[in-house]
Design a protein with these regions (language model features):
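Short, hinge-like loop/turn segments at secondary-structure boundaries
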Residues: 62-65, 136-138, 164-166
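N-terminal glycine-/serine-/threonine-rich beta1-alpha1-beta2 phosphate-ribose binding loop
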Residues: 3-113
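Conserved anion/nucleotide-ligand pocket segment
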Residues: 161-174
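A secondary-structure boundary/capping signal
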Residues: 15, 120-121
Length: 174
């Protein structure tokens, strides 16, 4: 942030359902205001479902997102991590908006490879204490954060979304 250079945050979003799609749309709509008001450049660099991904190290455009079915390629989590490393991406946040028990197994390799975690998936916190303990130890070892929020109403994580919108300059009313 020296000399007014914005901080780039690279987002990898896992899940394209109702919650994931809404989150992606909100990010596209709010990121110009977030850049202007907070000097944070949010870039979605990957959008994935359980089997396929669209990746662009420079950032995915709304048009790329709309063309997901045309641009998607099969992937494994290790390949996606390798792509991120190949392009030397920093300030990585993996966002899990799946409801998948299987996807939670990717949390440890993501953290070990430089990702902070944000999740609307409740499973990691309820899968069992041994996994939760290992996740917390790995987060501490790699100095990473794990933020999570359960869903309400129409299935959208509310508190952090409201905070983000407020910080981007939106007026919140009852």
């Amino acid at each position: 942030e020296i000399f007014q250079i914005s901080k780039r945050i690279n987002l990898v979003i896992f899940g394209r359902g109702t919650v994931g799609g809404t989150l992606i749309e909100q990010i596209f709509q709010a990121r110009a205001d977030i850049l202007k008001r907070r000097n944070i450049n949010l870039q979605i660099v990957a959008i994935a479902n359980s089997k396929e991904v669209v990746f662009n190290h420079k950032g995915i455009s709304p048009a790329d997102y709309t063309a997901f079915d045309t641009l998607k390629v099969p992937y494994q989590i290790s390949e996606l991590i390798a792509q991120v490393q190949q392009h030397h991406l920093e300030n990585l946040i993996a966002i899990d908006v799946t409801a998948s028990k299987a996807f939670v197994e990717n949390y440890l390799p993501l953290v070990e490879n430089g990702f902070d975690l944000v999740s609307a998936n409740k499973i990691a916190n309820t899968i069992g204490y041994p996994f939760y303990k290992k996740l917390r130890e790995t987060l501490t070892q790699y100095k990473k954060q794990y933020l999570y929020e359960t869903n309400v109403g129409a299935g959208l994580p509310l508190i952090d979304t409201i905070k983000l919108l407020h910080h981007s300059g939106e007026n919140i009313t009852r």
